[in-house]
Regions:
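Conserved core segment of the aminotransferase class I/II
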Residues: 1-10, 38
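Conserved glycine-rich beta-strand-loop-beta hairpin in the small C-terminal domain of fold type I
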Residues: 2, 13-30
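Short amphipathic beta-strand starts and helix->beta connectors
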Residues: 7-14, 78-83
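Short, solvent-exposed loop/turn segments at secondary-structure junctions
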Residues: 18-20, 34, 57-60, 101-103
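Alpha-helical elements of Rossmann-like donor-binding domains used by nucleotide-donor carbohydrate transfer enzymes
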Residues: 26, 110-114
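Short, conserved charged micro-motifs
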Residues: 34-41, 103-110
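Conserved PLP cofactor-binding pocket of PLP-dependent enzymes
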Residues: 41-95
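Short, proline-centered helix/strand-breaking motifs
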Residues: 97-99
Length: 114
């Protein structure tokens, strides 16, 4: 799948931090902004390809929404709404594609055509 999308203009593949180990359950890439990520997701859905977590799951997979953690809220002056603007921008401009063990042979080409 990486080869199918690596040369698409406007897509930057995510680089995993040094020393980390990926779980190999998703391919994550970045696009210029939130609007592009949402357009990408819509195009993928037209190809019957769902995304995994990004861009849609920032409401529960992002520390900005973790108001149930009083220590985190207190550490950021009582509100998390504007505590992580760079993280929000990066997450909103990310798309995550699921990786399956028995992926259909045409899956990468369908991703690329979206």
């Amino acid at each position: 799948m990486l080869a199918a999308i690596a040369d698409i203009r406007g897509i930057t593949l995510r680089v995993e931090p040094q020393g980390s180990n990926g779980t190999a359950d998703a391919v994550v890439f970045n696009v210029p902004d939130k609007a592009a990520a949402l357009r990408c997701r819509a195009a993928l859905l037209e190809q019957t390809i769902s995304t995994k977590i990004l861009p849609e799951a920032t409401t529960w997979h992002f520390a900005e929404t973790w108001t149930h953690m009083p220590e985190l809220v207190a550490a950021h002056g009582g509100t998390l709404t504007e505590a992580f603007p760079r993280s929000r921008a990066r997450l909103e401009a990310s798309v995550s594609l699921p990786v399956f063990v028995n992926m259909a042979a045409d899956f990468p080409s369908r991703v690329a055509s979206a």
